């Protein structure tokens, strides 16, 4: 019957509290007025708590929190504001797994059953003591958990504001600040409603225990005052004013720069006011603007010599003649030539600026000085519309700012400073080093050139071998018949390197017949074929000749000398 509690573990601190196994309702005859008052207060409190738990705004904020954490996990996984938001998410998940909403709904359904039943004045159905005690325990645990959630929200708020002072991820930090503040407000209202629900629940438990005592948590005494149970964290949230953060001084200036109110906008100069007032004066001085719309206006006809007063649509409908096209072409050519002449000085200015910034970067000794130089470089590159260089320098600025804060705590980062300086100098000297769009075509061109260079000597070798094989003597064929016959008897053909021995033999040979020329050419073009194929070719080429067997033997001897 009673809930088993582990030694040292408090029952309100558990995520899952087991339900009572006995009957959940109790019929009371002739209920007292105090019982009616308690049940009415409990039903009202349960309705308010369920309304705040099921609010769509709270669900939307929780969904936004989960999506922000999921989308920025890889980029901001080790940042302190991100970790604080992770703690907020853990508290929300624990609150969901407690099933506080379900237990409160069950209790409200048991209390509202008396209104539907007839004759409820004589007999009253109330929840049993174990059901009320389970809800009381969940209310205590929910209040403690909500206090922890509010603390995590405050911590995340302060860390995001501090991170906002670094001028990094400004939009994301603003979103996180607004999200955390809204979650803090919503859950503070939920905590207030849970605290107001605890007192009528405790009085209802006392009334039910006096009618039919059936305790569920025997080793735990429910506190009479929940504020004493919650401790100083409750006073920090509700009664003590939160102190202003010291790190928000620079943040307010930054936010004022980003979001200026209409009252804070700078006043216009007299020159701008005069410029704005001139066209209005011209409009008033124009006689056409002073026409009374209530009277009929006489349309005055224009003569041919008079020019149109305002916008004429027929000028756009007429086609341009040859003279106009020639003038436009001349203007376009002149603009192109002007661009070519102005291209060299812009490149010279860029190289001069890059050399100056590299010298200044090399002289820096701390990350604070380096970040200042990077900021100046970013401003210059953005003014010259160098997007790739600006993005590269922006990423380096983020890293240097982080190392600057680490360096301010007393750590020496000389190696990291040197590495960052070298990477920045290389980027500035080589121009668009970070852009990867230029590298693949260069690699393809170089590979194509290497392949074309390697193919040319192969063609030369083939032509020289053809020329040399055409010079084959008749006297050496007889000397090589014996070696070819021996290899035929053994039945194995040993293949070795063809080029060196074949070249030496072919250089010593004399001119052959016309028939042998055709056969050797077939060997060089199709070197992967076997001896039977070559013999078939020789027979097809020399089927009219009487001594085909001798020529075939001579050809076999030549290939044997070559090692084929």
UniProtKB/Swiss-Prot annotation:
Q: Positions of the region Disordered?
A: 431-495
In the UniProt record, does the keyword Lipid metabolism occur?
no
Q: Where in the cell is it found?
A: Nucleus; Nucleus, Nucleolus
Write down any Gene Ontology CC term: nucleolus
Return any one Pfam family short name. Answer: NEPRO_N
Q: Which family does it belong to?
A: Belongs to the nepro family.
General function of this protein: May play a role in cortex development as part of the Notch signaling pathway. Downstream of Notch may repress the expression of proneural genes and inhibit neuronal differentiation thereby maintaining neural progenitors. May also play a role in preimplentation embryo development.
Name the record gives this protein? Nucleolus and neural progenitor protein
Species, as recorded: Mus musculus
